[in-house]
Amino acid sequence: MEQASFVVIDETGIHARPATLLVQAASKYSSDVQIEYTGKKVNLKSIMGVMSLGIGKGADITIYTEGSDEKEAIEGLTEVLKKEGLAE
């Protein structure tokens, strides 16, 4: 299992557009990918799950990956979060 923690820096948090980008990125990997916020974990491949978390600016989030390409998945998702200016 791989994991990485981030602080959301986007002014509007993880709303529809960035949530869609994250779901699309997570869906490229065969590993299980989850995102955790305030103690609740959801499947990062589910747009409804991600949106249900209501992640705002300043939120501490953790992404977990587990499976055959877990390392590539965590690296790819980290790149998306940073490249899009969503989290650091």
Swiss-Prot record:
NCBIfam families: PRK13780.1, PTS_HPr_family. The modification Phosphoserine is found at residue 46. Signal peptide: none annotated. GO terms for biological process: phosphoenolpyruvate-dependent sugar phosphotransferase system. General (non sugar-specific) component of the phosphoenolpyruvate-dependent sugar phosphotransferase system (sugar PTS). This major carbohydrate active-transport system catalyzes the phosphorylation of incoming sugar substrates concomitantly with their translocation across the cell membrane. The phosphoryl group from phosphoenolpyruvate (PEP) is transferred to the phosphoryl carrier protein HPr by enzyme I. Phospho-HPr then transfers it to the PTS EIIA domain. It comes from Listeria monocytogenes serovar 1/2a (strain ATCC BAA-679 / EGD-e). It is found in: Cytoplasm. Residues 1-88 form the HPr domain. The active site is at residue 15. Keywords: Cytoplasm, Phosphoprotein, Phosphotransferase system, Sugar transport, Transcription, Transcription regulation, Transport. Belongs to the HPr family. GO terms for cellular component: cytoplasm. Phosphorylation on Ser-46 inhibits the phosphoryl transfer from enzyme I to HPr. It holds the Pfam family PTS-HPr. The lineage of its organism: Bacteria, Bacillati, Bacillota, Bacilli, Bacillales. This is Phosphocarrier protein HPr. InterPro entries: HPr (IPR050399), HPr-like (IPR000032), HPr-like_sf (IPR035895), PTS_HPr_His_P_site (IPR001020), PTS_HPr_Ser_P_site (IPR002114). CDD domains: PTS-HPr_like. It comes from the Bacteria.
